[in-house]
Regions:
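Acidic/histidine-rich catalytic neighborhood
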Residues: 226-227, 235-275
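His/Asp/Glu-rich, glycine-adjacent segments
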Residues: 79-196, 288, 292
Length: 410
C-alpha cells in the first residue's frame, strides 16, 4: 500500500507539470473521532506512508468544545464556534427560544444557525464547483449555501459507496467537475465511544480507516488530475469507566423541576440558560458550592482561548473534568448494555487541558511538500490552507494562512 501512495503522489505531480497548470483539486476527508496517537497503536501503512511522502502534524487541536458539529464546521469556515454559531452539538438559541440538536434535521438544514463562508460557498463565489459526501452545514435548505453536489446525511450508506461517488465526481467533464470535495466517515468515533479508545474494537476500526484511506488513494491515482488529499478528524477521545464515580448528576446540583432554567447537556459540558438574569449569581453560587469533578463558569468568566462569548453558550456553563461525565439522573449509563467497570469514550473536554482531545492532520499531493512535519495546530487554520491551494481569497476569518504555509509547494 505504501507503493500505491507513492505512485499517487508522482502521478499527480506529473499532471501538474510546468507546461500545464490547471486549478488543483482538494479532497478533505474526516475520520470522526480519530485521536492523534491512534496511528501509533496499530500497523497503519497508508497513514504512515503519507507521513513520509506528504505532510503531517503532531496533532490537530479542536476548538472548544471538542465536539463533532462545532469542529467540522470550524474546519470549513476557519472560524471558532463562538463566531460561526454552532457552539455545541446541542444548545439553546435565546433569540428563537428553541433547542438546536444535531439529530434534528429541521435545525441542521436551517441557514439561521450557520454563519461564516464555508469553503464550498467560497468556491462558488470564485467560479469553482464543489461536492460533499456528508459534512456539517452542507445540506442547508437554501440551495446557494450548499455545495453543487451533496448528499443528506445517512449513516447507513456504506463507506465504499462514499468513496466510489468521490471518484465519480472526479471523472465528470471538466465543466461539471468539483474542485473541492468533502468526505466523511463516522469511524472510529462510534467504536471509541462504545468501547473506549484503547479497546480492540477501536483498534480494528483504526485499521479499517487505514484501509479506506488506501482504497481512496488507489482510486485517485488512476485519475490524471492534480489532486491534493487532506485527512483530518474533528476531535480525539478520552477513556472513561462505567462506575458511579464517573458521573456528575445534574439532579444533585440543580433543581431540575425549575422550568425557568433551560438545560442543554452535552455530557462533557452542560449549558444553563437562566430566564431571569437576576438569578444568575445565586444559581452560579449554588452550583459552584457543590462542585466536585467539574467547574462552573459565568459567561464573562469563560477562558479567552475558547472565543465563546456568545448568547448561544449558556449563561452558566458546567464543564466536567477529563474522565467524568454529566448525566441528568442517577444510574444513567453510557449504554444500557455496558458492563460495570468497563470502558467507554467521551470527548468535548477543553483541548487545552487534555491532549487526548487532539485529532489528526495529514496531507499529500502536488501542492504539498513531502516529508514535512509540523507541530500541533488549531483546526481553524485548515481553511486558509485549502483556499491557498485553490487560489481563493479568504474573507475575514480566525484562521491564519501563515500557520501552514511551510507545507506548501511554492
Amino acid at each position: 500500500m505504501l507503493r500505491i501512495i507513492i505512485i499517487f503522489l508522482c502521478s499527480v505531480v506529473i499532471g501538474n507539470g510546468a507546461n500545464c497548470q490547471p486549478t488543483p483539486y482538494v479532497i478533505l476527508v474526516s475520520f470522526d473521532g480519530f485521536r492523534h496517537d491512534y496511528v501509533e497503536q496499530v500497523n497503519a501503512p497508508n497513514f504512515k506512508a503519507i507521513m513520509k511522502q506528504g505532510a503531517h502534524a503532531d496533532g490537530l487541536i479542536p476548538c472548544f468544545p471538542s465536539k463533532t458539529f462545532p469542529n467540522h464546521y470550524s474546519i470549513v469556515t476557519g472560524l471558532y464556534p463562538g463566531h460561526h454559531g454552532l457552539v455545541d452539538n446541542t444548545f439553546y438559541d435565546p433569540n428563537r427560544k428553541e433547542l438546536y440538536e444535531m439529530k434534528n434535521r429541521k435545525r441542521t438544514t436551517d441557514p439561521y444557525y450557520f454563519g461564516g463562508t464555508p469553503l464550498w460557498k467560497l468556491a462558488r463565489q470564485n467560479g469553482l464547483k464543489s461536492a460533499s459526501f456528508f459534512w456539517v452545514g452542507s445540506e442547508l435548505s437554501q440551495p446557494d449555501l450548499r455545495p453543487d453536489y451533496y448528499f443528506p446525511y445517512d449513516e447507513s450508506i456504506s463507506d465504499s459507496i462514499r468513496i466510489a461517488q468521490v471518484v465519480q465526481w472526479l471523472k465528470l467533464p471538466e465543466s461539471e467537475r468539483p474542485h473541492f470535495i468533502t468526505l466523511y466517515f463516522s469511524s472510529p468515533d462510534n467504536e471509541g465511544h462504545n468501547f473506549g479508545p484503547s479497546s480492540n474494537e477501536t483498534k480494528r476500526a483504526i485499521l479499517r480507516s487505514d484501509s479506506l484511506l488506501g482504497i481512496l488513494v488507489n482510486n485517485i491515482r488512476q485519475i490524471p488530475l492534480p489532486v491534493n488529499l487532506i485527512v483530518v478528524s474533528d476531535h480525539g477521545m478520552e477513556e472513561l469507566r462505567e462506575v458511579p464515580e464517573t458521573y456528575i448528576f445534574l439532579n444533585e446540583i440543580l433543581n431540575r423541576s425549575d422550568a425557568t432554567i433551560k438545560v442543554a447537556n452535552g455530557g462533557t459540558q452542560c449549558h444553563l440558560y437562566i430566564e431571569d438574569p437576576t438569578r444568575i449569581d445565586s444559581i452560579y453560587s449554588s452550583v459552584k458550592m457543590k462542585a466536585k469533578n467539574y467547574s462552573v463558569y459565568k459567561r464573562e468568566e469563560f477562558p479567552k482561548r475558547w472565543h465563546y462569548d456568545t448568547p448561544r453558550a449558556g449563561d452558566l456553563l458546567i464543564t466536567a473534568n477529563p474522565g467524568y461525565y454529566i448525566v441528568d439522573r442517577e444510574r444513567t449509563k453510557w449504554l444500557s448494555q455496558i458492563e460495570p467497570g468497563s470502558a467507554f469514550g467521551a470527548h468535548g473536554y477543553d483541548p487545552a487541558i487534555t491532549k487526548n482531545m487532539r485529532g489528526i492532520f495529514y496531507a499529500i499531493g502536488p501542492n504539498i511538500k513531502a516529508g514535512k512535519k509540523v507541530k500541533a495546530f488549531e483546526n481553524i487554520h485548515i481553511y486558509p490552507l485549502i483556499a491557498s491551494i485553490l487560489g481563493l481569497t479568504t474573507p475575514a476569518i480566525d484562521g491564519n494562512p501563515k500557520v501552514l504555509e511551510s507545507i506548501l509547494v511554492r
